[in-house]
Amino acid sequence: PDVSREQQLQSQELGALLNDFLATLSDENRRIFMRRYWYGESIGEIAQRFRLGESNVKTKLMRTRNALRAFLEKEGVKP
């Protein structure tokens, strides 16, 4: 099989899983996660935007990353 085609399918599959995971999050946690990892905003910018302390934002991101890791492992995705 064509390696690039296989990689493309894996990317699409991973993207679909990520969307499924994001749908499980609260609106606030999803928006914080997207601001950090999709838009590349700093912790400080996110804290200001959501009127939260930086430590609160860091905790939310850590918990969301841990939940994502567990979700992907449950779906059979290896790190």
Give a label for each model feature.
Residues 1-23:
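Acidic, proline/glycine-rich intrinsically disordered inter-domain spacer in sigma factors
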Residues 5-9, 30, 55:
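Short, contiguous strand/loop micro-motifs
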Residues 18, 29, 38, 43-44, ...:
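DNA-recognition helix of helix-turn-helix
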Residues 26:
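ABC transporter NBD signature
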Residues 78-79:
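Intrinsically disordered, low-complexity basic tails/linkers immediately adjacent to helix-turn-helix/homeobox/MYB/SANT
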